[in-house]
Amino acid sequence: MALELAVDWRIDNILEAIILMLPAMIANATPVVAGGRRPVDMGVVLPDGRRLLGDGKTIEGLLAGFAAGSAAGVLAALASGNMLLAVHSPAIALGALAGDMAGSFVKRRLGIERGRPAPLLDQLDFYLGALAVSIALGYTWTPRVAVEAAAAVLLLHLAANITAYLLGLKKVPW
């Protein structure tokens, strides 16, 4: 008799989506608090004369975001009973951080300076990175929930940024 393992990795409600994206949201927010001095791009300037990413993406922030996002995933796994999230959360956290760096790359190529707004890109780049990683891990999302989760992440991101600005952790509220 063969042992069959049935795992439902379908994300079909907003609560599941928020729980799965918690490591991404924490990973994305942590570098703001962690700060850092050593830029991830090591000062590389591309042929367009602009930095690859800029001083806002630091090694310290990347490591802190990865650690905090991974830890948040373990806590979310314990709270939700989805122990697989504890295993997947480091990858989801890295996906979020990669998405955020991709957003910075795009902003630099468009000539948007560090700290200047790029509506939607600033709020959803990390979500798209984490979403891509979750799909690569085998999670399936209903289109409705993916859009609802994007809207929820957008609102949570805006609220977190305004709060960080009011607390003096960020220079701008976006």
Curated annotation (Swiss-Prot):
It catalyses: 2,3-bis-O-(geranylgeranyl)-sn-glycerol 1-phosphate + CTP + H(+) = CDP-2,3-bis-O-(geranylgeranyl)-sn-glycerol + diphosphate. One of its GO terms (cellular component) is plasma membrane. It holds the Pfam family CarS-like. One of its GO terms (biological process) is glycerophospholipid biosynthetic process. The keyword Transferase applies. It comes from Aeropyrum pernix (strain ATCC 700893 / DSM 11879 / JCM 9820 / NBRC 100138 / K1). Its EC number is 2.7.7.67. It is found in: Cell membrane. It is a multi-pass membrane protein. It is an enzyme of class 2 (transferase). Its cofactor is Mg(2+). Coiled coil: none annotated. Pathway: Membrane lipid metabolism; glycerophospholipid metabolism. Catalyzes the formation of CDP-2,3-bis-(O-geranylgeranyl)-sn-glycerol (CDP-archaeol) from 2,3-bis-(O-geranylgeranyl)-sn-glycerol 1-phosphate (DGGGP) and CTP. This reaction is the third ether-bond-formation step in the biosynthesis of archaeal membrane lipids. The gene is carS. It comes from the Archaea. This is CDP-archaeol synthase.
